[in-house]
Structures are given as structure tokens and as C-alpha cells.
Amino acid sequence: MSFETFNFTAAINKAITESGYKDPTEIQQKSIPEILLNKHILASAQTGTGKTAAFVLPILELLLQDKNKVRGPRVLIVSPTRELANQITDSVKKYARHTNINSATVVGGMSYKLQNKLLSKPLDILIATPGRLLDLFKQGKIKFKDTKIMVLDEADKMLDMGFVPDIRKIFNATTKQQQMLMFSATLDKSVSKIASEFLTNPLTISIKPDTKGHSN
């Protein structure tokens, strides 16, 4: 299988080529077509298997297909730590660089003034840590009525760090009609339980830990 199988737009294919990717990794082969079909996904994949691209690439494609003009954010990506959120931000910028899709990141440690400025403009993709996202929502700086896709990345880590109550509050503030994507290094009972709360009839994808791929 090659990336051409997914029929991405030329702008995304150009970014994939420039990133040096030849063939999609296993998590990408299994996730991308299903995400493009707007399915809810519960996926288990280790870091280094290309899981970030597995959700970012099809999300960008779906955004390009949606011509509706809204304030956004149209996509919400929640990550447990500032470091992981910044890594996702780098990937989004890399894959979207030949498009007009814009993104912003709100995490702990950044000034509220800067983040408020980022949120004052129409936004396609918002990448955030749970605590800061919830703070900004409570302040009325973010609304989720336009959110069509929500990603919970590193779900097992968010569980370990005690973020589930925050995630629940954020989820309850959405329309609950959005496509839900949940990625985790493990799929134990606690992760599956949380998934059952947020996802509707999800397709479960599990990639063995020894599967290797490109880093993003």
C-alpha cells in the first residue's frame, strides 16, 4: 500500500513526499481510511509507529473537503502534556504547510494574553492540554459548537495523570455529535471504559508494540 491509495489532495501529498515518507505504517494503513469515513476510532499504538500522522493527515483532508466557513475550532486535539501537544503542533504545521488550514496551541506555561490573542481569530485546529483548555472554556474564550472532530491522544497517560474529569467536562461542552478519535499506547480495561463513555460504536485498532515506522 502507498499513500496514493488514500487519494489525498495534492497539497497533502506534497507535504507527505517532502517529509520523506514512502509507504504508510500499519497504524496509518488501518486508521486513515476509517477516519476519512468519519468513523469513531479507538486505536492502540506506541510512539514511533507514525500514529500522529495517522490522525492528522486524514483530519486535514476532511477539513479541506468541508467548505463551510465557521469560527471554529473545527478540530480539537487534546494531549496530556505541553511537550506532546507541541509535538502534535509541529506535525500539523508540517503536513498543512501547503494548505490554508490554520492551527493554534494552548497549554500550561503560556501566557493567557498570547493564548487569548490566538483564540480571537477563526480557527481550524486547536491543540491543547486539558487543564488550560478547560480554564479558557470557563473564561468564555473557547466555544465548541463548530467542533466536528475531537482527538484524545495518549489516553492512557491522561488517565494516569487524572485528567478524565477535565476531559469529561470538555466533552460535555461539545455538541457530542463530533467524530471521536482516541489513541492510546495501551488498551486496558480502564482505557476501554473511558472510550465507551466518549466514543460511539468505535472501530478498535491495535498495533503490536514491535511495529516500527517513521517517527510522526
What kind of feature is each model-predicted range?
Residues L76, Y95, A104, Q115, ...:
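Interdomain coupling/hinge region of P-loop NTPase helicase/AAA+ cores
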Residues T5, A11-K14, E18-Y21, N68-K138, ...:
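Conserved nucleic-acid-binding Ia/Ib motif block in the N-terminal RecA-like helicase ATPase lobe
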Residues P24-I27, P33-E34, P58, P73, ...:
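Proline-centered helix-kink/hinge sites
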Residues K22, L42, L60, A85, ...:
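Nucleotide phosphate-binding site architecture
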Residues Q29-I41, T52-K69, N86, S91-Y95, ...:
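Walker A/P-loop NTP-binding motif
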Residues M1-S44:
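Conserved pre-motif I regulatory segment
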